[in-house]
UniProtKB/Swiss-Prot annotation:
This is Succinate dehydrogenase assembly factor 3, mitochondrial. It comes from the Eukaryota. The keyword Chaperone applies. Belongs to the complex I LYR family. SDHAF3 subfamily. One of its GO terms (cellular component) is mitochondrial matrix.
Length: 135
């Protein structure tokens, strides 16, 4: 990601939902943010979910490495920084996805989200029988 210094420290007042950005926050550069997310995974997630989360974060940061559009960069960094803050504060447990964000997703993104949900459910043992066998 090629990022200008002025973009790194811009307050993303128009990105994300108003509730999640009640205070203006300075964006972390990509590498420190990446390290912060991996550190939070190490502290907050169980080993199986940490492996899944780490591999997902690595693939997303690799996929967006060549992004040059400033709006995409700010949006990407903002969402990952909010994710890290939620994990650090334990406010993510039991939280549902915002309908506005779901509406903005492309078909490919919705497919990826569905695959992620299936993977998580299979890790928990819920997805194997699709809820038919309860013990």
């Amino acid at each position: 990601m090629r990022i200008f210094t002025r973009l790194l420290y811009a307050a993303p007042s128009n990105m994300g939902s108003a509730a999640s950005l009640s205070e203006a926050l300075a964006l972390l550069p990509p590498i420190p943010l990446y390290r912060r997310i991996l550190r939070v995974h190490r502290k907050k997630l169980d080993p199986e979910m940490r492996i899944l989360g780490d591999s997902y974060v690595k693939s997303e940061f690799r996929a967006h490495r060549g992004t040059e559009n400033p709006l995409h960069i700010i949006g990407f960094l903002t969402e990952w920084q909010l994710y890290a803050q939620k994990l650090e504060g334990d406010s993510w447990i039991g939280e549902k996805l915002d309908q506005g964000k779901l509406d903005k997703m492309s078909d490919q993104q919705l497919g990826q989200l569905y695959e992620l949900m299936q993977t998580i459910q299979n890790k928990d043992g819920k997805g194997e029988g699709e809820g038919e066998s309860e013990k």
